[in-house]
From Swiss-Prot:
Cellular component terms (Gene Ontology): cytoplasm
Family: Belongs to the DTD family.
Purpose: An aminoacyl-tRNA editing enzyme that deacylates mischarged D-aminoacyl-tRNAs. Also deacylates mischarged glycyl-tRNA(Ala), protecting cells against glycine mischarging by AlaRS. Acts via tRNA-based rather than protein-based catalysis; rejects L-amino acids rather than detecting D-amino acids in the active site. By recycling D-aminoacyl-tRNA to D-amino acids and free tRNA molecules, this enzyme counteracts the toxicity associated with the formation of D-aminoacyl-tRNA entities in vivo and helps enforce protein L-homochirality.
EC code: 3.1.1.96
One Gene Ontology term from the biological process aspect of the record: D-amino acid catabolic process
Keywords assigned: Cytoplasm, Hydrolase, RNA-binding, tRNA-binding
Name of the top EC class for this enzyme: hydrolase
Protein name: D-aminoacyl-tRNA deacylase
InterPro entries the record matches: Daa-tRNA_deacyls_DTD, DTD-like_sf
Amino acid sequence: MRAVVQRVSEAFVEVEGEVVGRIGLGLLVLLGVGQKDSLEDALYLARKIVNLRVFPDAQDKMNLSLKDVGGEVLLVSQFTLYADTRKGNRPSFAKAAPPDQGKRLYEAALEAFLQQGVHVETGVYGAHMRVHLVNDGPVTLFLDSEERFRPR
């Protein structure tokens, strides 16, 4: 499972011109589900994201987590994080999970955020969306649940 995580001062997502999710201070999480992903991947990423110390403390050092600052999450599905661009110019998405598996694990990640006491807003799974954000910092991180198995 892959996530692009952006620290934001505000963000919202629109579907067909209607705002369906909006947050203030927090993290915009673009979440992609791969064919090999499982519930453990969803739980791992949700825990990791909630506990990332990417918010500034009183000395302006990145030392506070989402929970520490009372931040929110805007969770948006993003299967294109599994794009393979090695051959030709048209991306292949063969490594992305099929829609039913992707939706199930996206919803598992959503539930994992909620279980940690985080307020979560969402886009609409599978819809064409417009995501608006004010990236604070800017701070943008790429996380891949497979990385947890690689040696440091």
